[in-house]
Amino acid sequence: MTQQTAQQEQQKSEVKIYSREELKQKTLAELQKIGKELGLTRTTGLKKEELIEKILKAQLEKSRLVFVKGVLEILPEGYGFLRMPENNYMPSWNDVYVAPSQIKKFGLRTGDTIEGFARLPRENEKYKALIRMESVNGLPPDPEILKRRPQFEKLTPLHPMERFKLEYDPNELSTRVVSLIAPIGKGQRGLIVAPPKAGKTVLLQKIAQAIIRNHPEVYLIILLIDERPEEVTEMRRIVKDKAEVVASTFDEPPERHMQVAEIVVEKAKRMVELKKDVVILMDSLTRFTRASNAVTPPTGRVLTGGIEITAFQRPKKFFGAARNIEEGGSLTIIATALVETGSKMDDVIYEEFKGTGNMEIHLDRRLMERRIFPAINIEKSGTRKEELLLEPWELQRIWVLRKFLSTMDPVEAMEFLLEKLRRFKTNEEFLKAMNA
């Protein structure tokens, strides 16, 4: 009986395992051949997608292995789990256990995107277990290659030097105004400072659409913390499959908010280590800090508004990860900060983050009340070191424009700028026409 069991295990291990992506790349004839090898009786007359599903199911029955893809979270105990994007990287029954020996052998880190094969749970086990890795962040699972990866914290941070093109529609004035008043570069650490109902979420959506349209090389993550579920659905429908939307809604506990945000930024860091450009649009940094305050053990050192001094450590580590990297790659974080909510804590949170960013967009309640969108306060908004992002002739004209607009009331200034922008299809045309 033991010999027979051993033979069965050997036969299982000899079954060639295909991932869903590998099967999608094969022709229908090749899929039919694979199906026959797996013992499928009916392979003709099926659509390609139907045949792929049958092959995956047959593979699972024969080998007891299943193809998995997730983001690694290493726990303090030394082992880890692959968290699934469809579950917003939250712990779930669908997670895959990763042994400490695998983590140590391959030099794996929290945030690594791993593809591979896992076996189903045995008796008295709760989770699938990772058996074989196919790739780590798109790299082959070679311990020598993976252990030579640079560490994000040791890379050289620089000021942003390459500007994001945010103009994608002549009639979309929100992103055109941002391009003029507070240009965003690769590696920017920006705050959108907004009172309630001033249009911060809509502005984030417009920025997301601009990046998707003009910068397909960028990996875009939209992180929604403590937001309403319907806003999550709306954002997913706007960006479709062009960006990753990760959310922890207001009905989740603060621990979940922290865990989701931290695994997202670790995933972004692993991509930047491979010289990729990543953008995180976060709504909101204020609620993330509130969640941090809720999970921080009380120390007795409390600021005005009831927030622990140590509650800022994790949000600052998150926000401070944004940087342009000299060796290649960048991590851009644009986060919203709430003000004028009636909560002293929110004002203290904004004051604490005020000097940490290198770009700020201030939304103004007065413009919002007059239904002027974008409700941007031009005088208060701007980008540090904007001369690195703009052409010299653009910079000179924008300075002249700002000087002229500073003599006006914020409402008049925005109305004037919008009226002028509507006359031209692009910002370049508008700036060149300023001579006349």
Swiss-Prot record:
Top-level EC class as recorded in UniProt: hydrolase
Annotated EC: 3.6.4.-
SUPFAM superfamilies: Nucleic acid-binding proteins, P-loop containing nucleoside triphosphate hydrolases, Rho N-terminal domain-like
Keywords, comma-separated and alphabetical: ATP-binding, Helicase, Hydrolase, Nucleotide-binding, RNA-binding, Transcription, Transcription regulation, Transcription termination
One matching Pfam family: ATP-synt_ab
GO molecular function: ATP binding; ATP hydrolysis activity; ATP-dependent activity, acting on RNA; helicase activity; RNA binding
InterPro entries reported in the protein's UniProt record: AAA+_ATPase, ATPase_F1/V1/A1_a/bsu_nucl-bd, CSD, NA-bd_OB-fold, P-loop_NTPase, Rho-like_N, Rho_factor_ATP-bd, Rho_N_sf
Domain Rho RNA-BD: 65-140
Any Gene Ontology biological process: DNA-templated transcription termination
Binding-site residues for ATP, renumbered to this chain: G185, K186, G187, Q188, R189, G190, K197, A198, G199, K200, T201, V202, R228
Keyword RNA-binding: yes
PANTHER family: TRANSCRIPTION TERMINATION FACTOR RHO
Protein family according to the UniProt entry: Belongs to the Rho family.
Oligomeric form and interacting partners: Homohexamer. The homohexamer assembles into an open ring structure.
Function: Facilitates transcription termination by a mechanism that involves Rho binding to the nascent RNA, activation of Rho's RNA-dependent ATPase activity, and release of the mRNA from the DNA template.
Name of protein: Transcription termination factor Rho
Species name: Aquifex aeolicus (strain VF5)
